[in-house]
């Protein structure tokens, strides 16, 4: 038998003493819920695991983007086949060291967070970069709903899809409401200190939120429980 055939398959957990299922649960708790690093540390202690809060920080930084990338890869392809795909675009301000920065988000008609993008300004250049990134990953949308920010039509003219723009009162509530879970999470983290950290966490948070979005308000209790169990089982199989 050759040395190559005897080699063990690569595991991202190989240099960690803790079980992979514990690491996955720690990342899920910290990213999904509005908990601080020390909150997660206390929850784990009640379950019999004595970890420092800095271990929680290390694990989410190391494995959060990896898990998010795998989730996104599984979800992007089916979404490209949607008929009458509608995007809702909106931007929210985030303070970093006292300076205003902007987090752009694209949400589809079913509440899926498609893209998160951080910029220093919200001008045409920023809007164009954001929309190009979203279109490159997800393909074109049949309709794009925005607010009255003039950067959107300016960027859409360059992209040649200004005819697909829709704007009106209450039309963009889906995008605006999608900011609320992130705002709660932001307060628990006591703000961000760097744009790079904000971009990283916003991307990971969006994909984890998508994975555990069971549309609870649209289905009965039994269907919700089945979807929740399936999502948890799939989460525990990430990076295997």
Predicted segments — roles?
Residues 1-240:
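Residue-level recognition of single "structural anchor" positions
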């Amino acid at each position: 038998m050759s040395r190559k055939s005897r080699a063990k398959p690569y595991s991202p957990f190989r240099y960690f003493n803790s079980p992979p299922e514990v690491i996955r649960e720690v990342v899920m708790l910290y990213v999904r819920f509005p908990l601080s690093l020390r909150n997660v540390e206390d929850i784990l202690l009640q379950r019999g695991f004595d970890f420092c809060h800095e271990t929680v920080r290390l694990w989410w930084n190391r494995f959060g983007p990896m898990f998010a990338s795998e989730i996104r890869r599984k979800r992007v392809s089916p979404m490209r086949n949607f008929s009458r795909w509608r995007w809702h675009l909106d931007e929210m301000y985030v303070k970093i060291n006292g300076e205003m920065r902007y987090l752009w988000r694209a949400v589809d008609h079913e509440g899926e967070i498609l893209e998160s993008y951080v910029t220093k300004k919200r001008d045409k250049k920023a809007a164009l970069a954001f929309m190009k990134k979203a279109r490159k990953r997800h393909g074109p949308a049949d309709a794009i709903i925005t607010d009255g920010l003039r950067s959107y039509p300016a960027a859409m003219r360059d992209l040649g899809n200004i005819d697909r723009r829709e704007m009106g009162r209450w039309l963009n509530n889906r995008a605006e409401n999608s900011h609320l879970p992130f705002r709660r999470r932001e307060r628990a983290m006591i703000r961000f200190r760097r744009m790079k950290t904000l971009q990283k966490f916003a991307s990971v948070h969006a994909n984890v939120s998508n994975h555990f979005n069971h549309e609870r308000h649209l289905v009965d209790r039994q269907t919700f429980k089945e979807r929740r169990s399936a999502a948890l089982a799939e989460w525990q199989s990430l990076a295997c």
